[in-house]
Amino acid sequence: MKIGVTAFLTFAILSHMPAYAGNVSEIVSGMSAADKRSNYIGTFVLRKSDKMMTMHVVHGVDDRGVWESMESLNGEARKIVRHNNEVISIYPDRKLVTVSKMGDKLGLHPILPENLDKLANYYTINQLGDDRIAGRETSVLNVQPKDAYRYGYKYWLDNETRVLLKCDLLDEKGEIVEQMMYTSFSNQTVVPQSAFNIPELNGFSRQMLNKNRGKQANIGWRATSMPQGFMLTQSTIRSGEDNESLHLMYSDGLASVSVFIESGENSTHRLAGASGMGALNAYGKQMNGTQITVMGEVPQATVATIAESMERTQ
């Protein structure tokens, strides 16, 4: 009789526990690998502040690497084509095309690194359970910051492919300040190569974004007070018609912050003090004729701390 009662209680407890599809490490490992092994077609909606953007996505993998095409379905016309780490962005209305190289982190949204040890110093990561997005079963991960210098995240990852189907960015109060969500998603055996064709660009102006990666880049600037965990991951020199600007990117492995340094007279960023819209916060200051602007999807304290600590090294 005791055995029967124990078995019944065990079944009752287990039946009310969430049926997790893999542990956190397995899910994160699949998330990191999904970009290099998945073929799919889908549509997602990106909500930032009071604006919404809808994008059609085609993602493919072949013997030449990873291909991705994203095309806006509302607002300004835009098409982005990526082959491995090269990204071509086309803006038909402005007759503009930009070409850039991406770093290790690919895609629109922060991807959790496979090695969670370093990230665990700044975030608590746990699995919340399962949910359905775009008609597909997903596993939900919660990423909670341990200090006030970064936001929190929630990830909905497709159980079959581990592709990110939904992502919430959460502020200090736990409120959603930005959201990406697929409304349709179809896993494919192969996708048509024609989806990645570049249209005729006659009459378009072309802008090349040259990037030097790594802390050894001779950039002439540094931040003397950086929130714990943020490291220089990328430096970019952008050349305009009458101005040259330096773009530095710092990251803790998940959140990223951009620093723009340019001549004050020809600056495209003329911000003084704090500013913010939705998840994006910015802080600007002038220093000896140089405009320094720091921005990122992080709390205001983070961009202000970095901006006020920037100094020349040469």
Q: Where in this protein do the model-derived segments appear?
A:
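Short, small/polar residue-rich loop motifs at catalytic or cofactor-binding pockets
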Residues: 74-76, 124, 149-151, 278-279
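Short, solvent-exposed recognition patches
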Residues: 203-287, 301
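N-terminal leader/targeting segments and the immediate start of mature chains
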Residues: 2-66, 120, 130-132, 267-314
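Gly/Pro-enriched, hydrophobic low-complexity segments
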Residues: 130, 134-202
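Short N-terminal edge-element motif at the start of the domain
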Residues: 97-99, 104-149
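Short, hydrophobic/aromatic-rich segments at coil-to-beta transitions
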Residues: 37-43, 63-69, 135-142, 163-166, ...
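Short, solvent-exposed coil/turn segments at beta-strand boundaries
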Residues: 36-37, 59-67, 81-86, 136, ...
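An acidic-aromatic
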Residues: 56-110, 166-183, 187
